[in-house]
């Protein structure tokens, strides 16, 4: 059986966002599931927009999510190889030169759209005479190159969408080499996939048209195309996710919002599938349950609050030994196991533990809360004597009920507000032993 090899091919022109990290995760998990290899390729042929700092940031995000790669390379290092294939396809008459300026092409596009026609290149350059070409060269025009798409049926079995068919007539011949000599994504991606023996490609359904063209490129080079799978797009409030929509970058999720790596990985690996979205502890567990066949063809709604809830579920199950090193990262080495176990059920993000430490160790400002001072004074007098334990809360509130007849919210909420300054949070039974007895009396009176 052929060894499974997948790849993730980001362009270092911006930060990773939730759409392309989902693609990275699924390609990595598919390779892991089948004991294969995962390759990281940087599509950096856009010389103007590609930046080293984006490449570094992409690698940092992938490492944070424990997405490790077996090989990595960038396309700029392979220009001589692309040139060989360029000459081969020119000889096969599957590449042809064009001399239109960007302004001329834009005008053609606008005219087609105004007539209700799709903006498909008219192949005018195929009919240029030798004299016309000579004139363009004398004008200083440099050619760009297009791939000639055969006007025939293109079909493949998609891992997610099932049978997909495309009419070659509906596809525009893509520019594969720009006038400045730089390569576009289309052809060099195919060359890389051939040379690195890529067997499976999972990507967004916005690439379906590209896939149809690239299948012809594989065939023009006498190679069998990889198996493709096209994911439904992630949408948020009726617009697809892209790196141009702010707030969805992985760096934002992990640095500014403070989400756990496995919460992010679990969520986006399962989003859009029939599998229940659960917080997995590690990537090996996630790979074990991963099934590409579980993914839906329908668009997938991304609600950021669902991700935060999953992060909460993950933290609830994290033992103190697992989190000790992480506490060092957020300068919270003063947190001990008892405190962690007490506040863990109410943490949305790890750094929230510092807020709860402050609540327990710093008197909250309750001046504007309009507290029932007489009731709180009475409650202070009823606080059980001796050491404060987890049983103290039960004993204390029972005695308060006996004396005041208060129950439920009428009993609990004033105590919570006075002790924590908040209407909700960890169980008071858990944090009460963490507050010094004198401090409890002080907050109540």
From Swiss-Prot:
Query: Which cellular component terms (GO) are annotated to the entry?
Result: cytoplasm
Task: Please tell me which stretches of this chain the record labels as motif 'KMSKS' region.
Answer: 240-244
Q: What organism is the protein native to? A: Rickettsia canadensis (strain McKiel)
Q: Does the keyword 4Fe-4S apply?
A: no
User: One Pfam match, by short name?
Assistant: Anticodon_2
Q: Mind telling me what this protein is named?
A: Glutamate--tRNA ligase 2
Q: Which family is annotated?
A: Belongs to the class-I aminoacyl-tRNA synthetase family. Glutamate--tRNA ligase type 1 subfamily.
- Classify the main location: cytoplasm
Reported function: Catalyzes the attachment of glutamate to tRNA(Glu) in a two-step reaction: glutamate is first activated by ATP to form Glu-AMP and then transferred to the acceptor end of tRNA(Glu).
| Positions that bind ATP | 243
Cellular location of this protein?
A: Cytoplasm
Tell me which PANTHER family the record gives.
GLUTAMATE--TRNA LIGASE (PTHR43311), GLUTAMATE--TRNA LIGASE, MITOCHONDRIAL-RELATED (PTHR43311:SF2)
The gene it comes from is gltX2
Alphabetized Gene3D superfamilies for the sequence: 1.10.10.350, HUPs
List the ranges annotated as motif 'HIGH' region.
10-20
């Amino acid at each position: 059986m052929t060894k499974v090899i997948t790849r993730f091919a980001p362009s270092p022109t911006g930060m990773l966002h939730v759409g392309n990290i989902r693609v990275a995760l699924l390609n990595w998990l598919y390779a892991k599931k089948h004991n294969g290899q995962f390759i990281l390729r940087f599509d950096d042929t856009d010389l103007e927009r590609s930046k080293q700092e984006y490449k570094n940031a992409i690698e940092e995000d992938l490492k944070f999510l424990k997405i490790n790669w077996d090989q990595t390379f960038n396309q700029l290092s392979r220009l001589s190889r692309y040139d060989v294939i360029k000459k081969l396809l020119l000889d096969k008459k599957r590449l042809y030169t064009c001399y239109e300026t960007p302004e001329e092409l834009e005008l053609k596009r606008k005219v087609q759209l105004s007539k209700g026609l799709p903006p498909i290149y008219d192949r005018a350059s195929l009919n240029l005479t030798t004299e016309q070409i000579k004139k363009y060269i004398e004008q200083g025009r440099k050619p760009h190159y297009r791939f000639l798409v055969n006007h025939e049926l293109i079909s493949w079995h998609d891992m997610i969408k099932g049978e997909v068919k495309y009419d070659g007539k509906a596809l525009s011949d893509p520019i594969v080499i720009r006038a400045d000599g730089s390569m576009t994504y289309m052809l060099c991606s195919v060359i890389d996939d051939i040379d690195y023996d890529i067997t499976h490609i999972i990507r967004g359904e916005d690439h379906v048209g590209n896939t149809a063209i690239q299948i012809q490129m594989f065939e023009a080079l006498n190679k069998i195309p990889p198996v493709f799978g096209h994911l439904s797009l992630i949408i948020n409030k009726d617009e697809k996710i892209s790196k141009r929509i702010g707030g969805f970058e992985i760096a934002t999720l992990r640095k500014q919002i403070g989400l756990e790596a496995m919460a992010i990985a679990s969520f986006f690996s399962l989003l859009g599938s029939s599998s229940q979205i659960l917080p997995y502890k590690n990537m090996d567990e996630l790979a074990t349950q991963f099934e590409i066949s579980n993914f839906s063809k329908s668009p997938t709604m991304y609600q950021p609050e669902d991700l935060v809830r999953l992060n909460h579920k993950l933290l609830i199950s994290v033992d103190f030994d697992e989190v000790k090193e992480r506490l060092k990262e957020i300068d919270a080495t003063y947190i001990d196991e008892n405190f962690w176990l007490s506040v863990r059920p109410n943490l949305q993000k790890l750094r929230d533990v510092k807020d709860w430490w402050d609540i327990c160790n710093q008197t909250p400002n309750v001046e504007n809360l309009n507290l029932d001072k007489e009731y709180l004074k009475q409650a202070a007098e009823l606080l059980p004597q001796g050491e404060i334990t987890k049983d103290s809360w039960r004993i204390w509130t029972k005695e308060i009920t006996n004396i005041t007849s208060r129950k439920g919210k009428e009993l609990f909420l004033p105590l919570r507000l006075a002790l924590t300054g908040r209407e909700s949070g960890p169980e008071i039974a858990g944090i009460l032993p963490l507050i010094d007895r004198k401090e409890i009396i002080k907050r109540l009176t």
